């Protein structure tokens, strides 16, 4: 489900540790390393966010979503759809179509985990510090190879070591954004949050790939 991939791609950019082989701005690297260490130290994380999308560099549509994560497991809910990764399989649940698709994660799906996805930036992106905007430090990520993305801007609260906003601009001038409206950490989250209960979807078409 491409929508979920794009959403998590930009949702979790704060958890990153970059390697010296890239063109790395020292100030940007230090900010990202501190943010990375902060997120990785948490047992669980909860984000409520506004996902924006549009074209020609302007956001024209917004949707609210929530995201739970515990180490390499997560649950995403947005637009009446749900995606669960239990550490082994990815479950895509489409309420409107009453369909569930179950699959082993491929390379891109495995990287949907906040930590695992962002570790890909070790080899795929150059980073630079662009300044302070609205009291947030802004880091620019530019892909080292063509991947459809022109650049990504991370807006980071340096004091809290947290991402507050992410802007992704594509080569075709499409724009997607994530604005974090609520963040909680180390919550007591029931383990069932990250598991798929087949009994709850008896009337759904369930396909395992």
Question: How would you describe each model-predicted region?
Answer:
Residues 105-134:
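Flexible, surface-exposed loop/linker segments and immediately adjacent secondary-structure boundaries
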